[in-house]
């Protein structure tokens, strides 16, 4: 029997607000344990929460970006459960009345596009963190308590692990473009739980699902879903029954293991939080958030193609990341050459970012300096080969490309006499290859070009070398 995988994702997106969701403590990651805390975080008697307005604005922005219905009136609720790193014994969340509902995210796949529907987006606060790797004891860090989250819940519309990964990547792209989160899975600012089930192809009823946690990369999301789906099929075909439960993904063993029975909503005893007033969103806020929405990747890529004349592929690669697209556009303003700018950004810049594990905002070469380097190439002042040397120097040196070229003596040689003299020496030193070339082995032309460029330390004008060499070889 052939089976179909059914996947829905619950994604927690940590917002990059300065302060927490319900108090004035810093929400920044990486501070010493238990330093970003106050009576509200610690649930001390009499401490009352106050909702951070920025959290509501970010939720509305994400709702607008994903074509959700924005609730004019929504309720904050208490989600009750016990865990050592949850001082209050409940988490402030939303249940019956979320701030956003019924949205859609479009994903691009090799076989075409697909829409994944959203059930809801709701506001939530994060819990603390239990630390188990210090000696034999368990420690609690409550810095993370109260850090604002948005939970994005999809319908079970995905049918393959790759679709789930593509959806998650698109969601990360959206929150990054909006500027509401860095979407860093490794640091936990984007966390994903997958609900997985299988059913016979053609069936309309859903199978029993399991929830998978502890997936900290897109690759692990794919692997975990693939493993869990295969496990379901093996259990069913072996005559067993799938138990609805929560399972942990073990990235070292590449398998899931049982964690606990899957909770239902009634297990959390949700009820409206009496300490917090309803969340009200008016038309003015929606208009203001709409005006603050950025130009999204698809629109920006289309503009790059029409305005700059670069290929659609280049535009698609560059606009994956908002900051990279900003970098490219700033480079074009200086260089005046969009295609050369896209080649450098997609080539040397992205290669360096990957090798050094950098984000573009930490890259040493500003778009203004890269644009200046491209202008030198186009002016014939340096060759592409020399430009790559200058590019490497610029990563360690704050000087402009022009200053580095002058200081290092890297200017391109366009002196016809000097190039002719170098070629003459090359031909005299390689008589055998010269005879072979003139006997019809014309592929040796590249050999002579390489020898000449090597002799002139890469500084010779490539076009002049080609033209002069061809005339001397054919003489």
Swiss-Prot record:
The gene is gatB. It comes from Chlorobaculum tepidum (strain ATCC 49652 / DSM 12025 / NBRC 103806 / TLS). This is Aspartyl/glutamyl-tRNA(Asn/Gln) amidotransferase subunit B. Transmembrane segments: none annotated. GO terms for biological process: glutaminyl-tRNAGln biosynthesis via transamidation; translation. It catalyses: L-glutamyl-tRNA(Gln) + L-glutamine + ATP + H2O = L-glutaminyl-tRNA(Gln) + L-glutamate + ADP + phosphate + H(+); L-aspartyl-tRNA(Asn) + L-glutamine + ATP + H2O = L-asparaginyl-tRNA(Asn) + L-glutamate + ADP + phosphate + 2 H(+). Keywords: ATP-binding, Ligase, Nucleotide-binding, Protein biosynthesis. Gene3D superfamilies: 1.10.10.410, GatB domain, N-terminal subdomain (1.10.150.380). It is an enzyme of class 6 (ligase). Its EC number is 6.3.5.-. It comes from the Bacteria.
């Amino acid at each position: 029997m052939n089976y179909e995988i059914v996947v829905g994702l619950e994604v927690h997106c940590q917002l990059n607000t300065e302060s927490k969701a319900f108090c004035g403590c810093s929400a920044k990651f990486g501070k010493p344990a238990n330093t970003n805390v106050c009576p509200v975080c610690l649930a001390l008697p009499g401490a009352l929460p106050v909702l951070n307005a920025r959290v509501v604005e970010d939720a509305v922005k994400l709702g607008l970006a994903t074509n959700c219905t924005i609730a004019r009136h929504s309720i904050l609720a208490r989600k009750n459960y016990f865990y050592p790193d949850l001082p209050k014994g409940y988490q402030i969340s939303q249940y019956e009345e979320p701030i956003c509902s019924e949205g859609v995210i479009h994903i691009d796949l090799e076989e075409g596009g697909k829409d994944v529907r959203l059930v809801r987006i709701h506001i939530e606060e994060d819990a603390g963190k239990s630390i188990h790797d210090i000696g034999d004891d368990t420690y609690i860090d409550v810095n993370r308590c109260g850090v604002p989250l948005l939970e994005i819940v999809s319908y079970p519309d995905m049918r393959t692990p790759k679709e789930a990964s593509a959806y998650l990547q698109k969601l990360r792209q959206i929150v990054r473009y909006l500027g509401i989160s860095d979407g860093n899975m490794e640091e936990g600012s984007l966390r994903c739980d997958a609900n997985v089930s299988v059913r016979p192809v053609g069936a309309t009823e859903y199978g029993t699902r399991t929830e998978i946690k502890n997936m900290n990369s897109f690759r692990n999301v794919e692997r975990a879903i693939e493993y869990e789906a295969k496990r379901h099929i093996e259990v069913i075909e072996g005559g067993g029954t799938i138990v609805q439960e929560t399972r942990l993904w073990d990235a070292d063993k590449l398998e899931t293991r049982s964690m606990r029975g899957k909770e239902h909503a009634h297990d959390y005893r949700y009820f409206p939080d009496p300490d917090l007033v309803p969340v009200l969103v008016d038309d003015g806020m929606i208009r203001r958030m709409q005006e603050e929405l950025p130009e999204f990747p698809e629109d920006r890529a289309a503009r790059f193609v029409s305005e700059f004349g670069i290929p659609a592929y280049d535009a698609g690669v560059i606009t994956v990341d908002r900051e990279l697209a900003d970098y490219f556009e700033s480079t074009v303003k200086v260089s005046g050459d969009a295609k050369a700018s896209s080649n450098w950004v997609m080539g040397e810049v992205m290669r360096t970012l990957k090798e050094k594990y950098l984000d573009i905002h930490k890259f040493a070469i500003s778009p203004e300096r890269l644009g200046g380097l491209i202008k030198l190439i186009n002016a014939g002042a340096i060759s592409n080969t020399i430009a790559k040397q200058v590019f490497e120097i610029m990563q360690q040196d704050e000087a402009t490309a022009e200053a580095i070229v002058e200081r290092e003596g890297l200017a391109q040689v366009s002196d016809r006499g000097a190039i002719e003299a170098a070629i003459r020496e090359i031909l005299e030193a390689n008589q055998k290859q010269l005879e072979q070339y003139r006997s019809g082995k014309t592929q040796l032309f590249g050999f002579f070009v390489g020898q000449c460029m090597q002799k002139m330390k890469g500084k010779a004008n490539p076009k002049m070398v080609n033209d002069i060499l061809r005339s001397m070889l054919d003489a």
